[in-house]
Amino acid sequence: MKKYFLILASFMLVACSSSEQNLTYSTKPILNITSSLSPLIQVETTQKSAVIKNKSQQLLNISYHLYWYDHLGVTQIWENQQESYSAQFLLKPQEQKSIDLTKPTVESKNYRLYLK
C-alpha cells in the first residue's frame, strides 16, 4: 500500500510541475506604458536601445524610468544609489527618438522601461 501511495504521489508531483520559464530569467525587455500614452506612441525595444515614435498629431512630453536587473531578477543600483534612471523628453508629431540603454553594472542582464 505504501508503495502505491509513493508512486501516486510521485506522478502527482510530476503532473504539477511546470516547464514554463520563470519571469526572472527572461531576457526579453519589460515595457510598461501608461494607458493614456499607449495609443499615441509606438515602441521598439532591443537589448541596447528603445525607439519611441509619436504616432499622434500633438506634442508629447514623455517621462521614463529605466530599471536594470541581474540574471536572478535583483534590481541593479546606479552609481548615485538609485534603483532607476529617470529622464524626460518632448516628441513632436510623427517624430521618433532612440534611448540608449546604458547598463549600471556588469551584472545587468535585463531591463524594465516604464513610459508615462
Swiss-Prot record:
UniProtKB keywords: Signal
Keyword check for Ligase: no
Stretch forming the signal peptide: 1-15
Keyword Kinase among UniProt keywords: no
Name of one Pfam family that matches: DUF1425
Cited CDD domains: DUF1425
InterPro entries linked to this entry: DUF1425, YcfL-like_sf
Protein name: Uncharacterized protein HI_0960
Lineage summary: Bacteria, Pseudomonadati, Pseudomonadota, Gammaproteobacteria, Pasteurellales
